[in-house]
């Protein structure tokens, strides 16, 4: 992070919306499948917010250029859903669309399989409350068992014995 002046206001993903009142960018990221693993989502949302504060009506190319210039990287989405979300959120922020227009509505038949139903974990990811890696292990109860992955040294072999003494 670049040096911040004393008493400067620093806004983070946790401060732009809540579960009850999402920011348009948070809602759009959920609706347009811009949240996959979610690791990059807070950075993209905050970066997009900065863009829309400077340019409320960007083109798709300007959105992509902004993310490139500011070092936002995602390995999961292919970027199209992220740009879609920014464009739709921008329309809400300009007053051209309502939040309901960018909110997932279940199909009339109630079918969710094959629909664009947002991932159940999307909300925690756009709010910045999702735990990753060491965050999770720090919250586990004492005595929790852990898994160690051991890869085979051969493609095909018959297991004759396992030494579980250290397990």
Regions found by a protein language model. Give the residues of each.
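Signature of N-terminal electron-transfer/Fe-S-associated modules in redox systems
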Residues: 1-105
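Cofactor-binding beta-sheet edge motifs in enzyme active sites
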Residues: 38, 68, 72, 79-85, ...
């Amino acid at each position: 992070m670049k040096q911040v002046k004393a008493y400067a206001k620093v806004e983070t993903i946790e401060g732009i919306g809540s579960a009850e009142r999402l920011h348009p960018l948070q809602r759009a990221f959920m609706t347009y499948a811009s949240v996959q693993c979610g690791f990059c989502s807070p950075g993209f949302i905050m970066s997009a917010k900065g863009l829309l504060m400077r340019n409320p009506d960007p083109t798709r190319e300007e959105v992509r250029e902004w993310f490139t210039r500011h070092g936002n990287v995602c390995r999961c989405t292919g970027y199209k859903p992220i740009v879609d979300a920014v464009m739709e959120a921008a329309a809400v922020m300009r007053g051209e669309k309502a939040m309901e227009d960018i909110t997932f509505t279940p199909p009339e038949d109630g079918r969710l399989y094959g629909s664009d139903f947002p991932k159940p974990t999307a909300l925690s990811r756009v709010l910045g409350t999702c735990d990753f890696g060491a965050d999770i292990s720090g919250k586990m109860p004492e005595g929790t068992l852990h898994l160690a992955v051991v890869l085979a040294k051969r493609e095909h072999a018959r297991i004759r014995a396992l030494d579980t003494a250290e397990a």
